[in-house]
């Protein structure tokens, strides 16, 4: 299933369900293509929603390499039984629809970092840490637990719980409505103004024909942290929903 969003903004991206994220056979490529309709907030903290359509493009080589429009790229460079770790590269899309007049429009960001994952009998525990090389230029991280499986011959369900963090450069740029002051960020910093969120996700996939599935995702996150006095933050709840079709090749 889709790996947990590192913070609520990532929940605005298209969620890809369990059916489209199963491990491929060892040393074999699998490709998933599809399209989903998505309902999401206009921007982080907005109570208003919009509906759009997004492509689903995923490629996996066994358990070693994963490429996705949603989750970026990752390579499990180190694998030892149920444990794996390696580098990740992700693209963060900023959502700037319906911003208040004069609000700072945060740029999209490319984030580079690493992940560590542990498979257990009941699910997967994963943590990630990334540095934004463009955009807000700060650090972010998340911790998630994913589980799921076959509940009927043609039906799979999945779930995720997650907590996420981003440093104060993100919250300054977004809720402060301005570009954060430039400073060197070689290592993660934890400050009183950092951004936190906690959330959960439910996935469902119903096989319609061999290699074709109807998929649906419902995701919710709660913005935590300090009480920012920002016209953007009209609600701390971020809900998204998507439904569509995916074809595996």
Show which residues each predicted segment covers:
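Residues that define the transmembrane beta-barrel architecture of outer-membrane proteins
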Residues: 29, 49-55, 59, 81, ...
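Short glycine/proline- and aromatic-enriched beta-strand/turn motifs that initiate or cap beta-hairpins
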Residues: 21-68, 73
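Repeated loop/turn-to-beta-strand initiation elements of outer-membrane beta-barrel proteins
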Residues: 31, 63-67, 83, 122-126, ...
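Membrane-embedded beta-strand positions of outer-membrane beta-barrel proteins
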Residues: 33-35, 57, 69, 85-89, ...
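Solvent-exposed loop/turn segments connecting transmembrane beta-strands
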Residues: 43-49, 67, 79, 106-107, ...
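Outer-membrane beta-barrel transmembrane domain signature
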Residues: 75-76, 134-235, 247-249
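Cleavable N-terminal export/targeting peptides
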Residues: 1-28
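Transmembrane beta-strands of outer-membrane beta-barrel pores
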Residues: 37-43, 61-63, 89-95, 120-122, ...
């Amino acid at each position: 299933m889709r790996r947990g969003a590192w913070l609520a903004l990532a929940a605005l991206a298209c969620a890809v369900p369990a059916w489209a994220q199963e491990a491929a056979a060892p040393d074999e490529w699998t490709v998933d293509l599809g399209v989903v309709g998505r309902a999401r907030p206009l921007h982080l903290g907005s109570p208003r929603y919009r509906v759009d359509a997004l492509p689903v493009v995923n490629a996996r080589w066994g358990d070693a390499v994963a490429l996705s429009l949603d989750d970026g790229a990752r390579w499990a460079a180190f694998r030892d039984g149920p444990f794996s770790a390696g580098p990740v590269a992700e693209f963060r899309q900023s959502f700037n629809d319906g911003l208040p007049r004069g609000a700072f429009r945060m740029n999209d960001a490319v984030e580079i970092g690493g992940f560590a994952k542990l498979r257990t009998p009941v699910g997967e525990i994963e943590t990630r840490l990334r540095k934004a090389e463009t955009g807000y230029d700060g650090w972010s991280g998340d911790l998630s637990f994913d589980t799921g499986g076959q509940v009927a011959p043609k039906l799979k369900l999945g779930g995720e719980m997650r907590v996420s963090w981003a440093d104060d450069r993100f919250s300054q740029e977004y809720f402060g409505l301005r570009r954060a002051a430039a400073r060197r960020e070689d290592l993660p910093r934890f400050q009183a103004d950092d951004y936190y969120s906690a959330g959960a996700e439910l996935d469902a996939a119903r096989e319609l024909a061999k290699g074709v599935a109807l998929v649906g995702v419902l995701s919710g996150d709660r913005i935590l942290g300090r009480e920012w006095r920002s016209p953007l933050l009209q609600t701390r709840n971020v809900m998204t929903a998507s439904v569509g079709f995916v074809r595996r090749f």
